[in-house]
UniProtKB/Swiss-Prot annotation:
It comes from Drosophila melanogaster (Fruit fly). This is Protein sly1 homolog. The gene is Slh. In embryos, from stage 14, expression is seen in posterior midgut, esophagus and salivary glands. No expression is seen in larval imaginal disks. Signal peptide: none annotated. Its main location: cytoplasm. Non-vital for development.
């Protein structure tokens, strides 16, 4: 069964094959073509199709729509962009300039009738109607970061951010446009999946606005005989991603949990995102190999599914990753030594001598070893890359005491007693950066049942002395007041935390042969626990009766008349799409991945796809909270 990511790749490959079925004989000579995309199209393609794969598909040139481009005759031009006025104006300009002989127009979202008529008029005026071969609505306007993780925007993601949804002075038409943008992308997602979901969401939230609009859009499409996109033949061969049973779409509002996005983390992928700004599966790390005095250039590191080490360890605790890198390095060195030893034992100096001695077992072993050299070199490249990334993370851990922050926050969330009073930690000049202390305090404030005013003031004074900007606290305080008055479960009881225990550091990592100097870093083992998003997902998938989730809306787009009443006899859901309106993070994603792994049995295969309007790390989220806090402190300053 194809994953979401694989189905999106297939849709884009079909588009690059000029919207005809991919030939089964891959050896067939591809049709050479040019790919022209806007920034949104680029963001969709870059995490899932490499430049090498584009070349294999016949794409000789890929360029930005709004860049200066020369005329290239006799080669099909594939456009992949949103049907915005700005983009359509540029396409019409290309028509007038006669840049290409053949145009294939592929829009990420459906183009309106009026816009297509304007485009046709421009083509007629430019005399290139015969040159336009295809115009397609592609329904792929989302970004697949993993097989089971997607976001809606990367560049200009602030348009769909937590701040954009919650700011005080958003006009009604702006909010409508924002919600429509989310709905259009979710609709495209389910067209790609080939399934119509049952929708659940909390009432009186941004999630409810999305849910009602999406239900309406799905229902209208299902009952339109000519335009129904959910027929088996209207999607890719093989039916929907989810088998037999329909999935549940659980729409959640970021307001349900502000602590997790600020939480210091300990798993590899989430750490890369938190401290190195991982974006679209690409991270930039300063090149330490630069010669002395030379300016260090950031080196791009691609973290994709072809990287076996990444796929195995992205969810692992950092010390486990460091140990695994060390083991991989030792394995590589052993393989290298084996080749050298075999060559020496046979008296072989160069590659040319091998041909004269293909007579015995030793030679056969050497031939196999030499043939495996390309794989060995690729293994070495990946080891070097992950050593570079892990070293950069380790430097941050030591400089900012990230291991201690993670350990303390886990204790705060699981209501354990801290070894040192929080006030002492915040006053400690050598304990982390100002941003780290502010994150810790906000989590402490959110998780505390009652925090006396006098204690709050002392803690705030310590934060200010540490150089913290407290603007975000104005918003967090207002948010907590509203959440405490809501009928749903109190925020203070939502968090359970797992707690941690410190075990002795791996001996391999403190030996002199290690690439990593791990002294002073705690080897924390985290007790498995469910975050708020995972707890709600479990309750909804299991159809368990719960005061909070029983009140969630229940919408079924397949019903001619929309009903909101829970059916009495409900079977548990095997598959779920969990979508966070207002921004998600790798911490929640990894928690859901770990949860669903535990739920797998030999008889039942369950799947969860996690998605979010945007992907933010703690620094970015704190910035959004500060912007919202600034509006509260000086409302007249906002326009």
């Amino acid at each position: 069964m194809l994953t979401l990511r694989e189905r999106q790749i297939n849709a884009i490959k079909q588009m690059l094959n000029l919207n005809s079925q991919q030939p089964k004989a891959l050896a067939a000579e591809p049709v050479w073509k040019i790919l022209i995309y806007d920034r949104v199209g680029q963001d969709i393609i870059s995490p899932i199709i490499s430049i090498k794969e584009l070349r294999e598909l016949g794409v000789t040139l890929h360029v930005q729509l709004h860049s200066d481009r020369d005329s290239i005759p006799d080669v099909p031009a594939i456009y992949f962009c949103l049907p915005t006025d700005e983009n359509l104006d540029r396409i019409q300009q290309d028509f007038s300039s006669g840049l290409y002989d053949v145009y294939h127009l592929n829009f990420l979202a459906p183009i309106t009738r009026s816009k297509i008529e304007n485009l046709a008029a421009a083509a007629l005026h430019a005399g290139c109607v015969a040159n336009i071969h295809r115009v397609y609505d592609q329904y792929v306007n989302f970004i697949s970061l993993e097989d089971d993780f997607f976001i809606l925007k990367h560049q200009q993601s602030d348009q769909l951010s937590y701040y954009a949804i919650n700011r005080a002075n958003t006009r009604d038409e702006e909010m409508e446009a924002l919600m429509d943008s989310i709905v259009d992308s979710l609709f495209a997602l389910f067209v790609t999946l080939g399934n119509v979901p049952i929708i659940r969401c909390p009432r009186n939230s941004a999630a409810e606005m999305v849910a009602r609009k999406l239900e309406k859009k799905l229902r209208e499409n299902l009952w339109d005989a000519r335009a129904n996109l959910f027929h088996m033949d209207a999607t890719q061969a093989g039916g929907g991603v989810f088998s037999f049973q329909r999935p549940v779409l659980l729409l959640l509002d970021r307001n349900m949990d502000l602590a997790t996005p600020l939480h210091h983390t300990w798993s590899y992928q989430a750490l890369v995102h938190d401290v190195l700004d991982l974006g679209l599966n690409l991270v930039y790390v300063e090149d330490e190999t630069a010669s002395a005095g030379a300016r260090k250039k950031p080196k791009a590191c691609d973290l994709d599914r072809n990287d076996r080490f990444w796929m195995t360890h992205k969810g692992s605790p950092f010390p486990t990753v460091a140990e695994a890198i060390q083991e991989e390095l030792e394995s590589y060195r052993n393989s290298e030594e084996e080749i050298k030893r075999l060559k020496t034992s046979m008296g072989i100096e160069g590659e040319s001598d091998i041909a004269f001695s293909l007579v015995n077992d030793t030679t056969a072993r050497l031939t196999n070893a030499v043939n495996s050299l390309p794989q060995l070199m690729e293994k070495k490249r990946l080891i070097d890359m992950h050593t570079k990334i892990a070293t950069a993370i380790l430097n941050f851990i030591k400089a900012r005491r990230l291991d201690s922050f993670f350990e303390i926050e886990e204790k705060v969330m699981s209501k354990q007693t801290l070894d040192r009073p929080l006030l002492d930690l915040l006053r400690d000049g050598e304990f982390g950066q100002a941003e780290d202390k502010l994150r810790l305090y906000i989590i402490y404030f959110i998780c505390a049942q009652q925090l006396p005013e006098s204690e709050q003031e002392r803690l705030k004074e310590a934060l200010q002395a540490a150089g913290c900007d407290l603007t975000a606290l104005a918003y967090v305080q207002r948010w907590k007041g509203i959440m405490n008055r809501s009928p749903s479960i109190s925020q203070a009881t939502q968090y359970e935390g797992g707690g941690t225990k410190t075990v002795s550091m791996f001996t391999k990592l403190v030996s002199q042969g290690s690439s990593f100097v791990m002294e002073g870093v705690k080897n924390l083992v985290v007790k498995r626990h469910n975050l708020p998003v995972t707890k709600i997902t479990e309750q909804v998938m299991e159809c368990r009766s719960n005061a909070e989730t029983d009140d969630y809306l229940y919408l079924d787009p397949k019903l001619l008349k929309g009903g909101e009443v829970l059916p009495k006899n409900r079977a548990p859901f095997q598959d779920a799409v969990v979508f966070m309106v207002g921004g998600g993070n790798y911490i929640e994603y990894q928690n859901l991945v770990d949860f669903i792994k535990q739920k797998q049995t030999s008889n039942v295969q369950r799947r969860i796809i996690y998605g979010a309007s945007t992907l933010t790390n703690a620094r970015q989220f704190l910035k959004e909270l500060s912007a919202l806090g600034g509006e509260i402190q000086s409302p007249t300053a906002t326009s």
